[in-house]
Amino acid sequence: MSGPQDILIGEDKLTEKCGVFGTFGASKEAARLAYYGLWALQHRGQESSGIASADTKNIYDHSDFGLVAHVYKDEDLSALHGHVSIGHNRYSTSGGRDACYNQPLINKDRTLAFAHNGNLPETHKLEKFLKKHKVEIGALNDSGMMAAAIEVYMQDGLTIEDAIEKSYPLFQGVFSALAMGKDRLVAFRDKFGIRPLSIAELDGGYVVSSETCAYDTIGAKF
């Protein structure tokens, strides 16, 4: 995307929310689909952009500060292998301008990638849970705490789906989120459905997005 609207970071109508996009089974180059999806969602966040992908063996990722068109080179996308991917355009609501807050977040074992749009104004229960499980929360924003809670249950042997179900009551706020493992993608949002998230079909697979405008870019059927 080009034009002056891309750099109006102070405009509320352009920077009030992040954008998330994910794809599963719609292409062997899922990261490229995520790139086009994030391009269409550029208006939802201009601070940073990131994509994570997986090929059943590994999780790969690339993120940086800036607009989608500037963050990814062709070689970056070529290095993001696999048939599943998630992407994120960030407008910060918590945390600061630090690379550690760029999303998708990847855990140390590289078994979980997490992208989140929303805000958790009440994190007392979540913080208490993480402290109980010896998770250092000092540098974590709400997105990081959500990912950490899911990882706690995954370390107990639960699948990503079950780990999300177990940790879901701890997430007090409004959000839409994507969690990706090496062979799966899970999309979920707050119980009131306040933050937008939809699903569409493409070439026998699925794509999910914060806004349906991203589907037009890649030809997905909503």
Question: In which residue ranges do the predicted regions lie?
Answer:
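Conserved short alpha-helical segments that host acidic/polar catalytic motifs at enzyme active sites
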Residues: M1-F222
